C-alpha cells in the first residue's frame, strides 16, 4: 500500500481494530520474539551466495537480534489489553506493518493509528510500548520472510533501522487521544507543560482509569469538563476519580 494513501491506511486501521474483541489483559508473547531472533541468527550463519537477500541478513543480523532483545525487555512485564491469544498492541503493530507492506514510515503509521484509534483508542501504556511492539512485529516478520522467499527483507530491515530515530520516538504523543483531550484545557495549562510533565499527567489519568474501571478517554473527558466548569484549575492537580 502506498505511503501517501493515508485514507486507505486509516480505513484499514479502523477495520483491523473493529475485528478485535478485548477479552482481558495479558503479557506479550515474548517467547515468539526470542525464537524469531534466534532463527535469524541461525539462518544468517547458513547464508550462501545463492541465498536470496542473504547479504541483507548477514549485514543486519546483529542489529535485528539486538532489536529483538530490546523488544523483549520492554514488553515482558507489561500487562496490556488482550484480544484472543494476542495483545491488542501486538495486533495493531502487526496490522500496521502489513498495511504498509513492510515499509514503515511515520506518515503511514500516523494514518493507520488514526483509523485504529477511531475504533479502539490505545491506552497510555500501549502507546509507550508502540516502538518496541513494532520492533517485535518486524523481527517476527523477518524470520517468516527468510523462512520463505525473503523478498520482503530489504523493506523490513530498513523499517527496523528507522524505528530507532527520533521521529518514531515522538509518534506516540502525537497519536495520543488522551493528550488531545487534555490539550483542550480552556486556560492552556496542559499545552504549556513540558513533555515530561504532560507524560506524568497522562500516567495519572491512566492510573485513575485502572482504579475506577473507566476508560482513559472517559477520565480525560471528565477532567476537561471539570476544568471548563472551574476555569481550568483541576489541570494543576491530579484529576479526581469521582464523578
Language model feature labels by segment:
Residues 46-49, 115-119, 177-185:
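Short, charged/polar, low-complexity loop and linker segments
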Residues 84, 99-107, 122-130, 166, ...:
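Short acidic, glycine/proline-enriched loop segments that cap or flank alpha-helices
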Residues 16-83:
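ATP-dependent phospho-/nucleotidyl transfer catalytic cores
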Residues 86-127, 134-148:
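Active-site activation/catalytic loop segments of kinase-like enzymes and analogous catalytic loops
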Residues 150-235:
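Soluble N-terminal domains of membrane-associated systems
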Residues 1-7:
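ATP-binding pocket architecture of kinase catalytic cores
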Residues 73, 83-91, 238:
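Active-site-adjacent "gating/activation" loops or surface patches in catalytic cores
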Residues 236-243:
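Conserved small/polar residues in nucleotide/adenosyl-binding loops
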Amino acid at each position: 500500500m502506498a505511503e501517501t494513501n493515508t485514507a486507505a491506511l486509516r480505513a484499514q486501521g479502523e477495520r483491523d481494530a473493529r475485528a478485535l474483541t478485548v477479552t482481558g489483559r495479558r503479557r506479550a508473547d515474548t517467547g515468539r520474539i526470542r525464537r524469531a531472533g534466534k532463527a535469524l541468527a541461525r539462518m544468517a550463519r547458513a547464508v550462501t551466495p545463492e541465498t536470496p537477500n542473504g547479504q541483507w541478513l548477514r549485514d543486519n543480523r546483529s542489529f535485528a537480534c539486538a532489536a529483538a532483545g530490546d523488544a523483549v525487555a520492554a514488553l515482558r512485564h507489561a500487562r496490556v489489553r488482550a484480544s484472543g491469544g494476542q495483545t491488542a498492541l501486538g495486533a495493531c503493530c502487526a496490522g500496521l506493518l502489513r498495511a504498509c507492506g513492510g515499509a514503515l514510515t511515520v506518515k503511514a503509521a500516523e494514518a493507520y493509528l488514526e483509523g485504529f484509534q477511531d475504533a479502539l483508542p490505545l491506552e497510555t501504556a500501549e502507546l509507550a510500548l508502540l516502538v518496541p511492539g513494532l520492533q517485535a512485529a518486524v523481527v517476527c516478520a523477518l524470520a517468516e520472510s527468510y523462512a520463505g522467499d525473503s523478498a520482503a527483507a530489504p523493506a523490513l530491515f530498513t523499517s527496523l533501522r528507522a524505528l530507532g530515530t527520533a521521529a518514531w520516538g515522538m509518534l506516540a504523543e502525537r497519536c495520543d487521544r488522551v493528550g488531545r483531550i487534555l490539550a483542550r484545557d480552556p486556560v492552556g495549562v496542559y499545552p504549556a507543560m513540558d513533555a515530561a510533565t504532560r507524560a506524568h499527567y497522562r500516567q495519572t489519568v491512566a492510573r485513575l482509569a485502572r482504579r475506577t474501571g473507566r476508560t482513559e478517554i472517559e477520565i480525560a473527558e471528565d477532567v476537561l469538563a471539570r476544568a471548563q466548569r472551574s476555569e481550568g484549575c483541576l489541570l494543576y492537580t491530579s484529576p479526581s476519580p469521582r464523578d
